[in-house]
Amino acid sequence: MNTMNHSLIVSTLSVVLFALATSLSVCAADENPESTADSALPSTPNVIMLMSDDQGWGDVGFNGNEVLQTPNLDGMAASGVRFERFYAAAPLCSPTRGSCLTGRYPFRYGILAAHTGGMRVGETTIPEMLKKKDYRTAFFGKWHVGWVKADEVSTRGFYSPPSHHGFDEYFATTSAVPTWNPTVTPQGWDSWGGEEGEPWKGGFPYVQNGVEAKENLDGDDSRVIMDRVIPFVEANKDQPFLATVWFHTPHEPVVAGEEYKKLYPKSGKARQNLYGCITAMDEQIGRLRAKLRELGIEKRTIVFFCSDNGPADGLAKKGVASTGGFHGHKHTMYDGGLLVPACAEWPGVIPPGTSTDARCSTVDYLPTIAGICLGDSAIKKSLPIDGVDLMPLMTGKVDMLDRDLFFGYRRLVQGIDGKAIISGDWKLLQEAKKGGKTRLYDLSKDPYEENDLSAASPERLSVLSQKLAEIEASCQRSRDGADYRY
């Protein structure tokens, strides 16, 4: 048996046992027909969207990693729903991030790779929708869908901060920072960003509501972020709020504090840093979950978690980071680049111990949150939305989703034009590299994409190729202005 599969079975059993041990009150409510989740559903629940950066499917306890310590994420999965097959809209950061906010494929809104654009104000985002119902909205962490400093000049991208897209408050960086001491280039780092020991990218990367932040920026970067999240939650405990928290962890430069590295004495240096910074992030997620319970608002707060794509190329190839056995990694159209760890928690609404292998995606966040907080009518009919409402799936009313999923990553100047479509159990992909081949896989029989059926199944190849072309053409019309008034 595949080692990760064996670990996954063990992890799943532990999740169920944890749920049974810790959720008796929720179960009792479920058994009482007069105390159903639907009848107790808040009309304006709080929404928290958590996202890690470059965390592989196999780099979390609830997906079977027996070494990496993520007790709070494991607790979330146990208390709510664990998504076994949750896909990022693209195999890298910026395109996926936009999909989380818009419910649309990256090829629709024109962010096709990292640092190649910025979020257009014509897009309708989750915070813009929720503000119409008097939600307070805030963003924390890595933005990466536009510059956050007005005077920042670059050959790629443009100024498009969170405040242009519905967020009342923000504490954000444009892109990556070291995961420990985020303002300083770490020891031994010899790539982009700066010289060892010098200021990271020449200065202070965080901007808070338009002003460069210069206080409380030392130590674990996830703690630096959460120190801004907690006051926002406390200040808005009596009114509905949206908190979008996008951690930098575990994106390179991957650095952990000594106390976190010591948790993994038998791991190599690279894995000590990777595991250490993920555990530090998990600790801050636990801090947030504890605060919700302290304030007594956990039952009117839904919390989502996912990664933005698979693990970084180098860390995956060296076996430091894990895709859980799935082929590929970040920057590839294989499932190792697209499948990410994901879960959601809403005590009293999402049954504890829920697990689904239905294929879900980051494009599903907007229609799900709109359905929960506003109703389906809140979505503009003139604006194509590619996601679906996941609440019926998360509450056990349906088992599967009948839809196709499209993924893309394009940087034509480098010959990169990666695309993929999943239709039913079949996946067609065009490799994201110059001269990349077209591949066809039956994921029901070949989840690790080892047996290319493009030559053996020409009819299936033709059908999926046509579907892919139709979706891409629709996205190009959106990207060229069909969805906006000029």
Predicted features by range, described:
Residues L17-A432, G436-R439, L443, P447-A473, ...:
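Formylglycine-dependent sulfatase
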Residues N2-V15:
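Bacterial N-terminal signal peptides that target proteins for export
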Residues M1-N2, Y486:
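Accessible peptide chain termini
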